[in-house]
């Protein structure tokens, strides 16, 4: 069974913990309690292949930003979350993706861009097209979720597993990876 380390990143209050807890336990956290860092483990079967996810729910506040490099270094897949009802959180997500590329020294890191709180449609500040355009620019999947209504939560974690499974395959076009069996 494959084990993957998934890191959930985003500004404070965007719903990182709510998404993670909804996926792991099936419950919604009503009260906002800023996270420093929390680890969760969950088995998941995607495309008939079982995996264990070790999910790191990170702090969104700037005072813990210095810890991000370490999280990123150890992560294999990244869920970048912003709130659909907070334009600033959408702007804040861009440097986080840049930080992933800088730390990993690789452009094709498994990343999913997530607009959360789709249940608050009437308060929306970030359009779907803005999210899609950014995901297209980054070459990654884009999803809109709601931890509260459990919209696309399981699909989100299944998709990051697919992205990590794909990234774990040797690149047939890369002479380095096809010349040897190192994975």
Curated annotation (Swiss-Prot):
Keyword Aminoacyl-tRNA synthetase among record annotations: no
InterPro entries: P-loop_NTPase, Rap2, Small_GTP-bd, Small_GTPase, Small_GTPase_Ras-type
GO biological process: actin cytoskeleton organization; cellular response to xenobiotic stimulus; establishment of protein localization; microvillus assembly; negative regulation of cell migration; positive regulation of protein autophosphorylation; positive regulation of protein phosphorylation; protein localization
Subcellular location: Midbody; Cell projection, Lamellipodium membrane; Golgi apparatus; Recycling endosome membrane
Gene3D superfamilies assigned: P-loop containing nucleotide triphosphate hydrolases
Residue positions where Cysteine methyl ester is found in the record: 180
Stored PROSITE patterns: RAS
Protein name as it appears in the record: Ras-related protein Rap-2a
């Amino acid at each position: 069974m494959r084990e993957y380390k998934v890191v959930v990143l985003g500004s404070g209050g965007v719903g990182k913990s709510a998404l993670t807890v909804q996926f792991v336990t099936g419950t919604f956290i009503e009260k906002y309690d800023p996270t420093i860092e929390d680890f969760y483990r969950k088995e998941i079967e995607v495309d008939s292949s079982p995996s264990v996810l070790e999910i790191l729910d990170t702090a969104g506040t700037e005072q813990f930003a210095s810890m991000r490099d370490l999280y990123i270094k150890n992560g294999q897949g990244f869920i970048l979350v912003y709130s659909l009802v907070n334009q600033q959180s959408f702007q804040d997500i861009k440097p986080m993706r840049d930080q992933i590329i800088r730390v990993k020294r690789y452009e094709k890191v498994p990343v999913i861009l997530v607009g959360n709180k789709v249940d608050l449609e009437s308060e929306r500040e970030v359009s779907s097209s803005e999210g899609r355009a950014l995901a297209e620019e980054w070459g990654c999947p884009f999803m809109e979720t709601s931890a509260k209504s459990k919209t696309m939560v399981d699909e989100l974690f299944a998709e990051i597993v697919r992205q990590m499974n794909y990234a774990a395959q040797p690149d047939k076009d890369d002479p380095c990876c096809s010349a040897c069996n190192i994975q």
